[in-house]
């Protein structure tokens, strides 16, 4: 009795496992043009090199839930005195699942006065958005936000 | 119809931090969309934006297809003297537009 129960469970797990594999394959085929986490980390490495990226100082303002991924307002601000000795050199914004990992690079200087940039971006899917700031002492700081998108950008047909 | 909209305060006090808002009308075609017949719509985006004040660069941005159509950018600068802001957008297919705005500093 106990032996037959064990077999049944194993069979069930086997079937469930194959179903999961079968389920995963079409997802990969449907979205060939999606940036992978490897592309994201490569894009980040491209900017920061071997430097350590720490969490903090950066504030990424983006709605947690957006209806239309074609235009998502986004503001990045960095806590910095913006003096000649201590300022933000640049702000870089990345995403996880758009066809390309980059969103934009913004270059500031000490005379910006306030390290804050706003724009409107496109998001192809619900995903994480990461902002990285490079300070004048060449340290990197980051912030990440999760965004849920109900209508994705990039997927509709052009007329 | 002007293709650029710029918002810069006309007057400011010396040392003020002012906000600059810019909007350029552009389709920002990503290059990832297809027509009904399956052809890829070629990429056509603005790739670079620069703002100069009296000739010196104060802000620059590299744009990617993930920037929404009609790129809208806001940023800040400290004003020390009266002068002219010059804005430049450069993109695919030889796209190049400029705009300018003046500010009086008291």
Each model region followed by its residue ranges:
Chain B
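Proline/serine/threonine-rich low-complexity linkers at boundaries of modular beta-sandwich domains
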Residues: 1-2
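Contiguous segments within soluble domain cores/interaction surfaces
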Residues: 5-10, 14-63, 68
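Extracellular Ig-like/FN3 beta-sandwich strand-entry sites
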Residues: 17, 80-84
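Short strand-edge motifs at loop-to-beta-strand transitions and within beta-strands
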Residues: 71-75
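Short, aromatic- and glycine-rich surface loops/edge beta-strands on solvent-exposed regions
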Residues: 83-91
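Short acidic/polar inter-strand loop motif in beta-rich domains
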Residues: 91-99
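Short beta-strand edge segments in extracellular beta-sheet folds
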Residues: 102-106
